[in-house]
C-alpha cells in the first residue's frame, strides 16, 4: 500500500503578544536527554505545515539550528521517545539550551524575543499580529481535513489504530504541570476520520471557511504588498504556508483571490520559502495521481466546495 505523502500532526497555536508561552516544565518531560541539549534544536517533519512555517522563520532570521526529523509517515510522533518530549505528540518542538517549547506560534514568539533581529513581528503591534495569527490556528483542523482529502488521500485509515493506542498510552499527559486536554481532542479527530472519512459536507464547510478568510486577506493585499503593510512579517510566513497547502489541494486562488495569488507567487520565488515547501518526486507523483482520480470522479476540491 502507498504510504501517505505528508500527513502532519502539528498545531500552530500560540500567544504572540502575551507573556504566557508554552514552555514545558520538567515533570512534563519523560525523555530526559533533551534537558542537556545545548543550542537551538528543532524537532520537525518535512511535510508538516507548522514545521514549514517555523523553518521559513528560522531562515529569515538567520538562526543556526540542529535538525531532528520526526517521520510522521511512520507515526514516530506517537512513540514513547517523542511523546516524552512533547506529550501532545505534535511538531514542531523547540529545545533551546534544554528548555522545551511547544506550539509553533509560541515558539516563534519566543524566538522573536530571544533573537530580535531582523524583526518579523512589528514592534508595538504584537497583540494585533497575535490576533491575526489566531485565525490561522482556528483553521488548523480545517486545513488538516482538506489536506487528507485532497492532497494525501491515504488508501487506509488516516491514522492506524495501533498508532493511536500508543499515542493515548504514552507521554506524561501534562503540559506545564497540568492535565492536558489537547491530546483527547486530537484522538477524537483521528478516530472520527478513521470511522467516517473526510466527508463532502465537512470539506465543503472547511473550504468555505477558508474562502471567507482569504477574501479578507485579498482586500488587505489590494492596497499593500504584505499582509501587515509594507514589510514582510510572520503573518506572511504563516499564511504563505496555508496558501501553499491549499494550492496543492486544488484551491482556485487565481480565480477567487487574485491579490493573494500574486502575493503567494512573489514569496514562492524566494529561496527561504521555496526550499521549505519543496516536494520530493514521489510526493509530486502521488499528488498527480490523486488529482487525476478526483477529476475523473468529479471530486476536485473546487467541485466539492461548489466554488
What residue ranges belong to the model's regions?
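Charged/polar, solvent-exposed surface patches and flexible loops
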Residues: 80, 84, 109, 113, ...
